Swiss-Prot record:
Listed GO MF terms: transition metal ion binding
UniProt entry keywords in alphabetical sequence: Ion transport, Iron, Iron transport, Transport
Superkingdom assignment: Bacteria
Naturally occurring in which organism (per UniProt): Campylobacter jejuni subsp. jejuni serotype O:2 (strain ATCC 700819 / NCTC 11168)
Protein name: Putative Fe(2+) transport protein A
Keyword Translocase: no
Phylogenetic lineage: Bacteria, Pseudomonadati, Campylobacterota, Epsilonproteobacteria, Campylobacterales
């Protein structure tokens, strides 16, 4: 399952980042690391952007970026 498939309010753990090097480095700098818990807060209309809570931070990703983050529901 990928991050963009989560429903608003669902919690998950990051399993893998399936992104190219530049995007992977960007995601890592935001705190998207393997085995980290996250919560999907909100999706925009038509799922174009996704707001995610990581620890005490909120990050907004494009749908294409969220598709590269593999997660498991908690």
């Amino acid at each position: 399952m990928t991050l963009n498939e989560l429903k608003d309010g669902q919690k998950a753990i990051i399993v893998n980042l399936n992104a190219h090097k530049e995007l992977k480095n960007r995601l890592l700098s935001f705190g998207f690391i393997k085995n980290k818990n996250l919560k999907k807060i909100h999706s925009s209309l038509k799922n174009a952007t996704i707001m995610v809570e990581l620890d005490t931070s909120c990050v907004i990703l494009r749908s294409d970026e969220a598709k590269t983050i593999e997660v498991n529901l908690i």
